[in-house]
Amino acid sequence: MRKAIIAMSGGVDSSVAALLTKETGDECIGATMKLFHNEDIGVKREKTCCSLDDVEDARNVCYRMGIRYYVFNFSERFKEDVMDRFVDAYEHGATPNPCIDCNRYLKFDKMFQRMRELEYDYIVTGHYARVEYDEEKNRYLLKKAVDDTKDQSYVLYMLTQEQLAHISLPLGGLRKTEVREIAEKHGFVNARKHDSQDICFVPDGDYAKFIEQYTGRKSIPGDFVDTEGNILGKHKGIIHYTLGQRRGLGIPAASRLYVCDISPKTNQVVLGNNEDLFHSELTATKVNLISCESLKEPMRLKAKIRYRHPEQEAVAWQTEDGVLHVRFDKPQRAITRGRQLCYMMEISL
């Protein structure tokens, strides 16, 4: 019998993942990560995925299944590796995805550390993705979920071979409707609970307000400029804008204007036409290849530059410095600094 830690958010997905793992006969405990105190960032407890209500939902599910339940306090690490990184990225003109950092530094790092300390064998999560071992390649592969509408392989791109060897994703072969049916059948209190949509520590979606409150610093106004460098007006501070943004610019023009670039060095926001947002190439650093050690030669693949972005045909190659270069068959809109690139070879990453 192996021993598993179930990472539980209080939602239906992780609850069903816990149930399916328990049904294998393995020893299980449920664990919720305490990431921050809501009052510290000025939000009500019921508005985030880290609320007391969520903890109680997870505890209730574990009680019904007869497994022990714990709350691990990772708030200090969350502040350093997720919230601080989020703020720093926005202040430098990038658009980060903090959910990926949370997976990287908390769920699949800090939780792994706790797993080893408790002498457990693997971690279970409610992500919609699949892990399979390829004997020919002698590597674990990360594959897309059966339910394309819920696939979360994009947010797991950073997983190492060691981590892939010690995780289980029971929902990868199920559809969301099936997961809810299982939860209802077993009387889970969260069977019809809505999925979380927003960044947990910015539930109202106002990133600029959060950053100002979190840092205690007011935004520094600067210039809107066109693609030729001509001043068009004043902006409220670069943290208020992201690439591709059209609304809230307050600049009169004969045609629609969009944010085409953000320069933290000059504190300028570049505005242009929609056509100015399209580019065919990008470079990516901090590369994590799952299906191979490195790209020895150019490779045809499908890539996506955002979580909900459709996969696009492209060719990729890696230079000696480890940087990944990607050229898309068709120009892509708003390739944004700070975002993650995920590529697929057939259904493997």
Specify the residue positions occupied by each region the protein language model found.
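ATP-dependent adenylation/nucleotidyltransferase module used to activate substrates
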Residues: 1-157, 168, 178, 184
